[in-house]
Structure formats: structure tokens, C-alpha cells
Amino acid sequence: MAENDERALQKVSLQSNDGQIITVDRVVAERSLLIKNLIEDLGDEAVMNEAIPLPNVNEPVLRKVVEWCEHHRKDPPQTTEDENDSRKKSTEIDEWDQKFMQVDQEMLFEIILAANYMDIKPLLDVGCKTVANMIKGKSPEEIRKTFNITNDFTPEEEEQIRRENEWAEDR
């Protein structure tokens, strides 16, 4: 059996910060560069016999991340050189990912934090693009309302900021 076929059949256990263990296919877990590098560093045996602790991710968020990784398991593997311009400029999100990101704000931000921690750049991009689309075209007041942010600037401070950033406004 080829090495890739063996990897496809292997299972990996992930342990959330609340002690829950989720067992997934290794290829799914390796969508996370953190996990992929950990497996490479520790070797197959160590990881196959023990759950990988993820101290910054709780079970509901880990289940969502695993769901995303499962759906994207056949995507080309990410590389550290995946910093191309199209990724940075576009806020378009494919339909499945849009539906996946239709969660409450707390879950959305937890997914973004988990994607960052677990080094899953494509999921991090989808999360950040979702937030970008939520604020696109909105005034500061509308953004504050959307994210339940209290304005702690005095009117004088707001006016000074407005003057300093006048050049950036759409006209």
C-alpha cells in the first residue's frame, strides 16, 4: 500500500480544551498546519496512540473546524507560500463556506481564533472575509451596532480622528 493510501486510512484524535476527544481522518486533521507539523515532528506512532491536545479550542468550535476541514479535505494542501494577491484582495466566498459561516458572532470569532491557532489559513481567510463583508459599506455607528461596540471617544476626539483621516473617505 502506498504511503498516501496509508495516511488516508489513519485516524487522529483531537482533544478540545474541555476534554472532549474527536477522532478524524488524518488527512482531515492535516488541513491544520499545526497538526500536520506536529505529526511530522513527533512521528506517526506518538500521535496515533495519544490525543492531540488543542488547549485554545473548545468542543463546539473544534467540531465546526473539523466540519470545514472535512468538506475541504480534497482541496490542494496549503503551503507557507500561499500569500498570493488574489487571496488578499477578494472578499468573495463560495456558497458552501457562506452557509457554513452563518453562525452567531461569538461562534464566528471563535472559528477565526481557532483557524489562526491551528494554522488553517483558508478557513481563517473565509472567517475574515465574512467579517469584512459584514462591515463593508457601513458607517462607524452601524459597525458599532452590528458588533455591539460602545463608543468611548469624546465628540472632540471623534472630530480630530475625522479630520486626520479625511483623505481616506469616499467622496
From Swiss-Prot:
- Which biological processes are named by the entry's GO terms? exit from mitosis; G1/S transition of mitotic cell cycle; G2/M transition of mitotic cell cycle; kinetochore assembly; mitotic cell cycle; mitotic nuclear membrane biogenesis; negative regulation of cytoplasmic translation; negative regulation of mitotic metaphase/anaphase transition
What's the superkingdom here?
Eukaryota
Span list, region Interaction with the F-box domain of F-box proteins: 112-171
What pathway is this protein a component of? Answer: Protein modification; protein ubiquitination
Keyword Zinc in record: no
Among InterPro entries, the record links this protein to: SKP1 (IPR016897), SKP1-like (IPR001232), SKP1-like_dim_sf (IPR036296), SKP1/BTB/POZ_sf (IPR011333), Skp1_comp_dimer (IPR016072), Skp1_comp_POZ (IPR016073)
Q: Which UniProt keywords apply?
A: Ubl conjugation pathway
Q: Which GO terms describe its molecular function?
A: cullin family protein binding; DNA replication origin binding; ubiquitin protein ligase activity
**What cellular-component terms does GO give this entry?**
CBF3 complex; cytoplasm; kinetochore; nuclear SCF ubiquitin ligase complex; nucleus; RAVE complex; single-stranded DNA-dependent ATP-dependent DNA helicase complex
Instruction: Report the sequence similarity comment from the record.
Output: Belongs to the SKP1 family.
Q: What is annotated about its quaternary structure and interactions?
A: Component of the SCF (SKP1-CUL1-F-box protein) E3 ubiquitin ligase complexes. Interacts with scon-2.
User: Tell me, what does this protein do in biology?
Assistant: Essential component of the SCF (SKP1-CUL1-F-box protein) E3 ubiquitin ligase complexes, which mediate the ubiquitination and subsequent proteasomal degradation of target proteins. Controls sulfur metabolite repression, probably by mediating the inactivation or degradation of the metR transcription factor.
Q: What is this protein called?
A: E3 ubiquitin ligase complex SCF subunit scon-3
The uppermost taxa in this organism's lineage are:
Eukaryota, Fungi, Dikarya, Ascomycota, Pezizomycotina
Which gene does this sequence derive from? scon-3
